[in-house]
Structures are given as structure tokens and as C-alpha cells.
């Protein structure tokens, strides 16, 4: 019923505590009052690790696999496992910890409460909008952190799958070989042009068309070949264009 709409727990409202003339005790309502640096860390935790990267992965794969509601994707074994790994497995070792909220607890609640909530009318088509402007923050920051920490991001699998999924999405062909309309993106025409010649169900039609995109630090924040995952993303992409059901088969293979 209607009351379920208001059960959008968890709600994390984090506000900078700068009220020169005093303020009500917002903490009693569950609001986190803190300094600006901590507010920024909470935001970074969300957009680079615990929430936004998961949304983008669900958006591009949701379009390819025929979903119209993000919440429904969490009932999908492969997609729910993909975002679990992006957030809890690959994101956590390099997450920004704001101190006032546990990143693990936040990500767990995102996975089990927030995204599966059927009263959140998010569609993959809407969230896939402007993905070229988002991947640098949503994936690039974690990739850069791995390079800084381990010298390479080659240990990653779920994040390369998400990026390969975006590249596959750019073909505008679903996993059954049917065309779909790409969501609005300022780079849409340029990106489609870079994929020129790549054809669904013809893996041999791929002759390196992704190299310019995957090496573009303006998009990802880092050259993905220098990060050690460019070749892996190309290989995943080729598997995902192999024919009907190839995207599903690729997800099953690597998750």
C-alpha cells in the first residue's frame, strides 16, 4: 500500500554542520551532522563505490537484457551477482571511508533494500543517460585506486564486465539481436562511429574498434590499457557480440 512508498530505508541525510545562528537538533531525526570534508567523503563513497557504479552496470545490462525496471534486475541471478561484486568485492578494498557510515553496511543496504525496492520507479533506460560523462567517476576512480595500490587493476573482473557491457550497449542491439534506442548521451554519435564495422553475431567483425575509447583518459580518467584491463574488456566485448544469448552466457561464465 501507500505506506510502503515511505519505507525507503535506509535514508542517509548528511549535512555540513554550519549554522551560525543555531539549529534544531536534526540528529534526533537521524540526520548526520558533520564537517564538510566528511560530507564530501560520504558523497565520494556513494558515487565511486557503493551506489552509482551499481546503477550504471544495471542500466546498460538492463537495456541489453530487456528490463524496464531497475528493481526487477535484482531478481536476476547474474545481474545481482555482478553488482554485488562491483560494490562489495572490488570496491571495498579501495573505498573512501567517511568514518560516520560503514561503507560495507551502506553497500549491503543498497543491494538488499534500496535497489530492489519496487516503489523506486528507476528504469535502466533513464539511468543509462549520459553514461560517457559518468564512467570516469563511477569506475575510473576505483581503477585508479587499484593502480595506485597494486600497480595494476588486472585483478578486477566485475568492473571490466560493466565497462564491456557499456561498450556492448552502444551497439544498440539487445541480447536477442533486436535493435533498441540508446539513451541520450552527448557523445552518442562519436561513440557509435568508433564502433563502425562491429556487427552483432560476427565476432570477427571486431578489429580493435574499442582501442581509442578504452585508452581515452578523458572518458575513464585513466588509459585502461595502462591500468592493465583494456585487453580484458576487449575480450569480454567480443564474447558478448557472439550472437543471441551471448551477453547472458558471458555473465554466467565470469560470475
Show the residue positions of the predicted features:
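C-terminal catalytic subdomain
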Residues: 61-190
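C-terminal amphipathic alpha-helical interaction region
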Residues: 156-255
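ABC transporter nucleotide-binding domains
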Residues: 17-18, 24-25, 200-202
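Short, small-residue-biased leader/transition segments that mark boundaries at the very start
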Residues: 2-6
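Conserved phosphate/anionic-ligand binding catalytic regions in large, soluble enzymes, centered on
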Residues: 46-62
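Active-site-adjacent bridging/hinge elements
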Residues: 20-39, 61-62
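Conserved phosphate-binding loops in nucleotide/dinucleotide-binding enzymes
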Residues: 39-46
